[in-house]
Amino acid sequence: YGERDMIVVTRGSKNRLRTSSKNCITRTKDDFGFPDGEGWLLLDHDTKDLPVSVKSKMADLGGIFAALTTIWPELAGADFLVRPSSSARVCIAGETPADATGFHMFVRLRSASDIPSALRALHARCWQHGLGYHLISKSGQMLDRSIIHVSVGSPERLSFTAPPILGPNVLRQAPPTVCHEGVAVDAPRQPYDLTWSRTRDIARQTAKPEADAR
């Protein structure tokens, strides 16, 4: 999908090409937005950095899909598609591919413009259910994380989900695609009218460590 006959350039290049006949866009919010009406919400899940406590909580709930329907019960009746990331189970010929550590789930929402707020709401619900945690960045900053990534809710971001182009002697044993037929659903709302706040979550972590910091 996307625009036909478009060239994606940097913002500086676009300014230089304004007078040319080329139809240019930048991969920024200046040129990318959410459509009116229905759209697909991306839930990006990866177990690579999950602390043991969060993995245990997911296991107690019955696995990742049970955890997702715990924080968002309407998901059970939704249209959604689950695919691995482009790099999942890619390996050199003759070697055993590593297990896929996550997936991309695309959920059909009634209003695409609700995608950013939906991810923030799900992130807050994750923290309420013991599915949130903190990471320490290389610079020493405390980063808020949960079993889904909030950052993918911006329309200009790339999602590496398509099958990769493989070079010689490189193979891929892709996990199967899961297609669930349902309906377009309303976006989840913030629990108890709370707004997700980094300051609040850090304060909660300091007062009562319900999630691990790594």
How would you name each of these model-derived features?
Residues 1, 126-214:
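Catalytic "initiation/cleavage/transfer" segments centered on a nucleophilic residue
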Residues 1-103, 107-129, 213:
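Signature for HUH/AEP ssDNA processing cores
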